[in-house]
Amino acid sequence: DLFAYRELKEIVPDCEDRYDQLERNMKLQDLYLTERFEEKQSEGFVGMMEGFLASLEDELMDFRTIEYKGIQKTEEELINLFYFKFQNAPLLSRMDAIRDYCVDEYETLLGRDLSEEELLIVQNKFDKMYVTKDIYKIYGWLLEECGYPVLPDVEYEKRKLEYEDVFPVLYLKYRLTGKAVHNHIKHLVIDEMQDYSYLQYVILNQIFKCRMTILGDKAQTLDEQMRDVLQFLPGVFDQKIHKIVMNKSYRNTM
């Protein structure tokens, strides 16, 4: 969880932790809160996020002709670059890739580099083609579209994510901006496997490409409901798993 909180610092300054979420749910005894939490960590919600992302390209962009000194790109040219040449770049990083392409083209033709000040002006022109680059707001659109309570519309300093939203927002961040793959990690060990959700395993599989050892006891969980992760792990890891089930305990309890 601490890793997720650090990754989200540029989006929200604070996140509810797992234990505060459990305590809040126990106090309120609200079945809907528990169900909503499980829904947002599920395979179905990942599907909703992917559907939302598929339509976001058109809703998030406001293309316009770029003209700055010798750099000139029409709206039509930018649309073609966005949807074809750079279609595989993450959505919120795509205009940066197009900007670099245009700047490189200009600098090659004129034989000189743009200054830092000029590059900032060009970057600002490209950034203005996004309706917003604020992932907090974009996640709010997703919640509204899916029929969930929306996030408070507040400035950065007053934002706080409930625990149920932490990993959906992290997933959205990685899909929109790209993710760092931790290639220096050679083997990952995950304990208490039963306390990780479908969505958490999807994120782990995206950022760690090494072999993993995943350990746990499905009968021991922080959640009220028992979660058998072995039901979905083969799908997350494309069947590339070797399962060992130990039916006898060697634990000594004093």
PLM feature segments, named:
Residues 26, 48-49, 61, 95, ...:
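Detector for methionine-enriched segments
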Residues 3-11, 149, 154, 173-187, ...:
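Conserved helicase motor core of SF1/SF2 NTP-dependent helicases
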Residues 10-18, 24, 65, 114, ...:
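Generic preference for flexible, low-structure residues
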